[in-house]
From Swiss-Prot:
Induction: By infection with the fungal pathogens B.cinerea and A.brassicicola, and avirulent and virulent strains of P.syringae pv tomato DC3000 (at protein level). Induced by ethylene and copper. Its main location: cytoplasm. This is Patatin-like protein 2. It comes from Arabidopsis thaliana (Mouse-ear cress). It comes from the Eukaryota.
């Protein structure tokens, strides 16, 4: 049989029918949930195109915020052979092994009081192990060297504005060509949990730019809309990679957006309870940070509402796949309680989410509702087929693609 080599890079959308986008939300240790989903999708692509198939071979853009930004870097950074540094199947084990070291849990007497005092005087974790780990894995690889286009948001605490690290922008703004390590550390620097990150970038002419960054979730916890915006800007700018696609041609966009779970179904708080809260309760309550959780969830949901409405209005609902779990409870809804038991629960949540029906947000209630009889698992199997076909079409049409191989 004949099969396209999975080692050939993805040819630009101008040679295909679709613009393919993968987006991964922020959420700390809850990144385990999309890690499971991504592992399943990649395994389905491997069934179609061989064991060397990787997600970066199929998506024009991979966007990620916070923990999703770290996953994005891991999926797109090249190894010595010029292939993705991590297979998607390896990310789940990475979380299970490394999260307890990134977010060490104190089980000694009075640990709760100790954590409270520490959270009021500085970040809950010093981030040293996380920084060492990211530098060890990603090295000096720069944004311009990723194997497909990436979009990773951060927030500049000095200028109080978002700073978006985008493969598209770096072509014209070399002072944004930071290392993936610095970008991943920055987008993960969640206020109250991890320290802000400072670094400098210098170009070949000796010009320098300083960055003072915190978690990208402050700006866009769900980066799907950012990714679409970056592509739209490229199309509007006349990029040959996208001709003849039009900026508003959402029927040509294929978006997979992965959430990291939330506790909406738990209905954890109510107005009567929080009416008497002061600054302390909003910042730390029952192993959570309610004010930060509220902003992050609102940010993610607004993007989901917008994209659901737009794709529905353009009769392209099938082109927008949002996989999210609203049923987390207790410690599972936290971003940092990295006990073995809790991490196992999150991994199982990812497995169970695959078996759940495909859901879409109800634009009136804001809740996810079952939209089809098919499951997320079957939707991903179908998506793998579409992605594989799209890649093959581009390889056939492009004069730059490697010749197909026979096996």
């Amino acid at each position: 049989m004949q099969m396209d080599s999975p080692k050939s890079p993805l040819q630009p959308p101008t040679y295909g029918n679709l613009v393919t986008i993968l987006s991964i939300d922020g959420g700390g240790i809850r990144g385990l949930i999309p890690a499971v989903i991504l592992g399943f999708l990649e395994s389905e692509l491997q069934k179609l195109d061989g064991e060397e198939a990787r997600l970066a071979d199929y998506f024009d853009v991979i966007a990620g915020t916070s923990t999703g930004g770290l996953v994005t870097a891991m999926l797109t950074a090249p190894n010595k052979e010029g292939r993705p540094l991590f297979a998607a199947s390896e990310i789940k084990d990475f979380y299970l092994e490394q999260c307890p070291k990134i977010f060490p849990q104190d089980h000694f007497p009075f640990s709760a009081a100790k954590k409270l005092v520490k959270s009021l005087t500085g970040p809950k974790y010093d981030g040293k192990y996380l920084h060492q780990l990211i530098h060890a894995k990603l090295g000096d690889t720069k944004l311009s060297q990723t194997l497909t286009n990436v979009v990773i948001p951060t927030f500049d605490i000095k200028h109080l504005q978002p700073t978006i690290f985008s493969s598209y922008e770096v072509k014209n703004h070399p002072l944004k060509d930071a290392t993936l390590a610095d970008i991943a550390i920055s987008t993960s620097a969640a206020p109250t949990y991890l320290p802000a990150h400072f670094f400098k970038v210098e170009d070949l002419n000796g010009n320098a730019k300083e960055y003072n960054l915190i978690d990208g979730g402050v700006a866009a916890n769900n980066p799907a809309l950012l990714a679409i915006g970056e592509v739209t800007n490229e199309i509007s700018g006349g990029s040959s990679d996208f001709f003849p696609i039009r900026p508003n041609d959402y029927g040509r966009f294929l978006v997979l957006s992965l959430g990291t779970g939330n506790h909406k179904a738990e209905e954890k708080f109510n107005a009567k309870e929080v009416a008497g809260w002061g600054l302390l309760n909003w910042l730390t309550h029952d192993n959570s940070t309610p004010i930060i959780d509220a902003f992050s969830q609102a940010s993610s949901d607004m993007v989901d509402f917008h994209l659901s409405a737009v794709f529905r209005a353009l009769h392209s609902e099938a082109n927008y796949i949002r996989i999210q779990d609203d049923t987390l409870t207790g410690d599972a809804a936290s971003v940092d309680i990295a006990t073995v038991e809790n991490l196992d629960i999150l991994a199982k949540t990812g497995d169970e989410l695959l078996k759940k029906p495909v859901a879409r947000v109800n634009l009136d209630s804001g809740c996810n509702e079952n939209a089809y009889e098919t499951t997320n698992e079957h939707a991903l199997i179908k998506l793998a087929g579409i992605l594989s076909k799209e890649k093959k079409i581009r390889d056939i049409r492009s004069p730059h693609a490697k010749a197909p191989i026979r096996i």
